[in-house]
């Protein structure tokens, strides 16, 4: 199994999202699952065809806003075959969490990705526990 952790920062980079993604990777590694971390703002030419499961880790553009980075939609359009892949979404920060999560889910599902679970996470420790309990298996 191969998992891709996609961080979606409001700018080009976010240390908090990187820490949460690396904690998720450690949690997945405990279960013997390989993972790669990609930044949708920087790694625009990467393909997601090789991955079995996707985990989107995003933050809202502003504290009161409900939008995530518009680069996510462009990244998914150019990422190869993503339709039918299973995914989880993690939202970090913001005041209007439910509205932001709905926006993130809408973007992910519009590309044909099957959303299995979603979570609001604020600390790297929570991310590690979430990833270690994530049910990632191949469905043939």
Question: Which sequence ranges carry the predicted segments?
Answer:
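FMN-binding flavodoxin-like domain, especially the glycine-rich phosphate-binding loop
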Residues: 2-140
């Amino acid at each position: 199994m191969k998992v891709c952790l996609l961080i979606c920062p409001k700018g080009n980079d976010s240390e908090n999202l990187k820490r949460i993604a690396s904690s998720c990777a450690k949690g997945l590694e405990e279960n013997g699952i390989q993972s790669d971390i990609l930044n949708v703002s920087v790694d625009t030419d990467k393909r997601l065809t090789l991955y079995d499961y996707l985990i989107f880790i995003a933050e809202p553009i502003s504290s009161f806003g409900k939008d995530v980075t518009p680069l996510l939609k462009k990244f998914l359009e150019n990422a190869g075959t993503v339709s039918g892949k299973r995914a989880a979404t993690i939202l970090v920060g913001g005041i209007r969490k439910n509205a932001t999560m709905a926006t993130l889910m809408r973007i992910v599902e519009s590309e044909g990705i099957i959303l299995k679970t979603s979570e609001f996470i604020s600390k790297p420790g929570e991310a590690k526990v979430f990833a270690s309990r994530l049910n990632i298996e191949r469905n043939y």
